[in-house]
Amino acid sequence: MNLAKYIDHTLLKPEATMTQVDQIIAEAKTYQFASVCLNPYWVKRASEALQDSDVKVVTVIGFPLGATTTATKVFEAQAAIENGADELDMVINVGELKAGHDEQVLSDIQAVVKAGHAAQKHVKVIIETCLLSDVEKRRACELSEKAGADFVKTSTGFSTGGATVADVTLMRSVVGDRLGVKASGGIHSKEDAEAMIAAGANRLGASAGVKIMNSK
């Protein structure tokens, strides 16, 4: 198994410096990770640095709370695409999901998916599993699929918990082979990575990608 091709090499902390961003980009080239995942501010720099590479540029939309307006998310998505983003990881409106306002959740996702797909870019939907019941996780996955998303993703890594094998298993059971499943948050070792893949993840968001690749 080529673990590198599963990994979105991630640096989303707010205090990330240009030097650290450049290091992430260099590591992604060296290890041939699937992508780098960076905040929108760094997308243009990463896109220019990776233009002669197979490494994609992923960024985050409505991050990390998901509580911005749909119009703001769409603007953010379009700006990211203009700056060279290949994939968009958006956060759902968690509060509206928990309140049972599924139409609002659906239209929010659909708007970002429309913006992404208009430019042939993949959209992943972060459902923030640590804040949801299993019933809510299922609804979030169903709404993401209905909205036309390409992936469902467990976590931002900025809330109360990250990916679990149980959540990845549940999400895969809902979306079948129709959508991708991205596990993110708390994946620190090769064992963690392999467990998530075995549970059904076909992409991993991790800041520990180099450590994972170098572990025996």
Swiss-Prot record:
Gene3D superfamilies given in the database record: Aldolase class I
InterPro entries: Aldolase_TIM (IPR013785), DeoC (IPR011343), DeoC/FbaB/LacD_aldolase (IPR002915), DeoC_typeI (IPR028581)
Assigned EC number: 4.1.2.4
Location in the cell: Cytoplasm
GO biological process, one term: 2-deoxyribose 1-phosphate catabolic process
Protein name listed in UniProt: Deoxyribose-phosphate aldolase
Catalytic reaction annotation: 2-deoxy-D-ribose 5-phosphate = D-glyceraldehyde 3-phosphate + acetaldehyde
Disulfide-bond pairs as recorded: none
Entry keyword set: Cytoplasm, Lyase, Schiff base
Organism whose genome encodes this protein: Latilactobacillus sakei subsp. sakei (strain 23K) (Lactobacillus sakei subsp. sakei)
Protein family (similarity comment): Belongs to the DeoC/FbaB aldolase family. DeoC type 1 subfamily.
Gene Ontology terms for molecular function: deoxyribose-phosphate aldolase activity
Signal peptide: none
Record has Hydrolase as a keyword: no
Protein's UniProt keywords contain Glycosyltransferase: no
Functional pathway: Carbohydrate degradation; 2-deoxy-D-ribose 1-phosphate degradation; D-glyceraldehyde 3-phosphate and acetaldehyde from 2-deoxy-alpha-D-ribose 1-phosphate: step 2/2
Main EC class the enzyme belongs to: lyase
Its job: Catalyzes a reversible aldol reaction between acetaldehyde and D-glyceraldehyde 3-phosphate to generate 2-deoxy-D-ribose 5-phosphate.
CDD domains: DeoC
Catalytic residues (positions): 89, 153, 182
A GO CC annotation given for this chain: cytoplasm
